[in-house]
């Protein structure tokens, strides 16, 4: 898996995903065309950068995460 450093954080390449969905108890957050993802062990939060350059912060507490890969199974 390809990685890169941004602002002192290591981001993983998740550009093979068409979308990524984080489900919470009362809502869900869907990110189209995610490109890079960082997980913070201390906070439990995720930072996701999408194809349009929008940064998303997903706090701890989500119940379920799912995504669809562009080229079939990718883990």
Predicted regions located by residue number:
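Eukaryotic intrinsically disordered, low-complexity regulatory linkers and tails enriched in Ser/Thr/Pro
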Residues: 1-75
């Amino acid at each position: 898996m390809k990685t890169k450093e941004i602002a002192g954080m290591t981001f993983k390449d998740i550009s093979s995903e068409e979308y990524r969905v984080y489900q919470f108890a009362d809502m869900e957050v869907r990110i189209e065309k995610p490109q890079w993802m960082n997980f913070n062990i201390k906070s439990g939060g995720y930072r996701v950068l999408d194809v349009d350059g929008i940064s998303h912060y997903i706090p701890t507490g989500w119940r379920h995460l799912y995504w669809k890969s562009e080229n079939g199974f990718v883990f």
